[in-house]
């Protein structure tokens, strides 16, 4: 049987997301619910994949089915493609399985040409509307299909408005729009070198190809990488008969949410534009009116819309984001989807849905996107400083949080300034999908145009970046990189502060502070604790970090890097002495100076953890990282050691390694300098004894982690030193104290021989940063130079240092667990690389049987 590449809306349902994409599946579901949906068909995601397999061509079989379904659509609507009497006009939209806002653009009014425009103008008696549709279609088709930039057309519109002395597009007459259409066609011919296509079927195939092609455009690739959307999914294409919101003042278009996407409050929220088409609202070209005003303008359509909202929210049991059009006072639903929301709103909505009996606690936890929880810990303005400040303007608070930075006017500048360590606020007329990387590099985004559903607002909310949109008081001069607001001129590099929760804009610097956690957060985390089996620890080297992580729910420290403690002023001198010593005795003497500091550090950590486990990794970096590089520091060290500057330079030179990542580091240091491991063991055990004495109700049980082992004999050698030293300390103190000695699995050989290593270890902890480096043979610091080329060539979809490679590195981890646990049934296993905070990596760790993950404090929730 031939493949089915095309489905009518009436042939699908919400469970067919993989095939029909999110938009197509939801249009089918709304059709099934009997809602007023302009009919059409969906070309499947498989057709997109096939398009790429066929060398970016739509093959004859797929084209044949599309033509077949155009005929079916003509039968359903009673209109004909390209017909003078009763022409069928359609919209063409992309729709991947996962929503990708602003990534794939829409084409409206497809099927128009000069003949059809004249016909619909005569038939409707509304020439202005007909020519408005045509000029929009030429502009969208040129931009989306042929990739002629929007700006050329916007400039022609702005010039026309200036010539006619009007402010708004809606003030242009039918003749003005007719003239614009011919100017647009001339622009098209100049840029493309051929006439604008008149044949509706040629237009349609061009548009479908453009949607497929846009699946692989740079901004889609960036968005997919950031949101774990596989390239292999492809996008569906939805071809839908047009409903017109721009036929006159009894028409309009809008976007609405069944709950507030910024706060989660249960009330209808959205925006509506009279005499406009859908893209006008989403693109933020005109600033719309609130949805409540629609009730005065179109009472019957509004009443029906409120009922539809309730039907959809009850059906999907989640907050819905809907697009709709009113044509001659009749309502048409164009799409629905689970609405994107801020992290605060996500928590409130999930809790409210449980309270309303629509969701279980377990379902509510599953509704929360873990990546969004980062944004809950958003900076806010310092309360005292905020009280003293007066806003210079107020616009729409489109994405919460507070931002303060230097003004930049382009996405490129935002990236450049951010790369050199400057905090920036990106100020734009409106953002477009090309600005995504610049938006990521900014502390906050401020736009002149656009509402709560504009591109800037939607993308900023998704990224957790503060955004204020629709500040019409700004008089922008992009060419000269300046704007005027409240009588003051602002230039590139001037400071500005914006509040994405209130929409307030402030002149100058207002300091920000970290956020605190609100009540719903606690409820959701409590439910999550009920259902989870994986423990969560934190990577922390200081008591302050440990305290913060405990507040956020960490159940212990999974990685304390002791080397960070050596860099403090009072210790580094002694440590350098140790490095430059000639004898064991001299080294021990220098280490003796560091011992009380290390012990104090560990005591403070145990205090902060209140009896929760603390895993202390012994010295890992190569010694060359600790020696001085400045001439003055070298002189000081020479004087302290009673050596010449030349001798010290000779020692430093001797520490130089060609490949330090694989050099003299980790437990190799303990093999060559056992006295370092002895000193660290004494500090760990003495600190534990002291804190245990002070708090008899706590169980202080240190976990000593030996890094970088690759052989069981090597691990045994160092473990024996640690155990002998620890047991001697415990005996001398006359106390009982349990402790564990484990190792990091960060070399492939350690994973391959984990059965042998498990005989010597109480626990394994995967150091996935190094394990990834060693498995791939990539240096983490240098991989950035070539990874972009790997993404472009579709060799990799993700940075393996950000998202765990489950196929290679993951296989080694699974192997280590399967080999280690039978040999040592009490072996507990964790992960402490950066991957410990990445949601998809954590899911994998759970699947292969890890006991805990450890991540930075702010990623604990």
Model-assigned labels for residue ranges:
Residues 41, 448-450, 469-472, 560, ...:
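Short beta->alpha connector loops at strand-helix junctions that form conserved
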Residues 329-332, 429-440, 444, 452-458, ...:
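Glycine-rich phosphate/ribose-binding loops and adjacent secondary-structure elements
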Residues 238, 408, 425-427, 446, ...:
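Structural motif
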Residues 208, 215, 377-408, 523-529, ...:
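Flexible inter-domain linker/hinge segments
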Residues 394-434, 485-523:
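Extended, non-globular alpha-helical segments
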Residues 93-94, 517, 527-860:
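Conserved alpha/beta-domain cores
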Residues 1-389, 416, 422-425, 432-437, ...:
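Nucleotide/phosphate-binding sheet-loop regions of phosphoryl- and nucleotidyl-transfer enzymes
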